[in-house]
Swiss-Prot record:
It comes from the Eukaryota. InterPro entries: LOB. This is LOB domain-containing protein 23. Pfam families: LOB. PANTHER family: LOB DOMAIN-CONTAINING PROTEIN 23-RELATED (PTHR31301:SF120), LOB DOMAIN-CONTAINING PROTEIN 4-RELATED (PTHR31301). It comes from Arabidopsis thaliana (Mouse-ear cress). Belongs to the LOB domain-containing protein family. Residues 4-105 form the LOB domain.
C-alpha cells in the first residue's frame, strides 16, 4: 500500500495499492482532476481504458480524458465539439478578414502604380 494515496483512491475512499493504475496519473495534490474524470466516465471505465493501453500511451490518454471531461463539465451539451466549432468560426472570420485586407492592399498598390505612371506622362 502506498503511504500517500493518489487522488483517485482518496476520492473513492479506498486504499491505494502499489500497483494502482491511477496513481501515476492522478497525484494526491490534484483531486479535482480525478473528480472531473470520474464524474463523466466513472472510475471503473477509466480503469479499464488505462489497463487496455500500453504504458507509454497512458499519460496522453489521461490528459485527453481530463481535457474532454473538463469540456463536458463546462459545456454539457457540446463539450469539446463546442470548442472546435468556436475555433473553426474564428479561423473562418480571420481568413475572411485576411482576404479583405489583401484585396485592399492590391487595390492600393494598383492605385499607387497608376499614380506613378501618370506622373511620368
Amino acid at each position: 500500500m502506498n503511504p500517500k494515496r493518489c487522488a483517485a483512491c482518496k476520492y473513492l475512499r479506498r486504499r491505494c495499492p502499489k500497483d494502482c493504475v491511477f496513481s501515476p496519473y492522478f497525484p494526491p495534490n490534484d483531486p479535482q482532476k480525478f473528480a472531473c474524470v470520474h464524474r463523466i466516465y466513472g472510475a471503473g471505465n477509466v480503469s479499464k481504458m488505462l489497463q487496455q493501453l500500453p504504458d507509454q500511451t497512458r499519460a496522453e490518454a489521461v490528459e485527453s480524458l481530463c481535457f474532454e471531461a473538463k469540456c463536458r463539465v463546462d459545456d454539457p451539451v457540446y463539450g469539446c465539439v463546442g470548442i472546435i466549432h468556436l475555433l473553426k468560426t474564428q479561423i473562418q472570420k480571420t481568413q475572411n478578414e485576411l482576404a479583405k485586407t489583401q484585396a485592399e492592399i492590391a487595390v492600393a498598390q494598383t492605385k499607387l502604380s497608376q499614380t506613378h505612371i501618370s506622373d511620368f506622362m
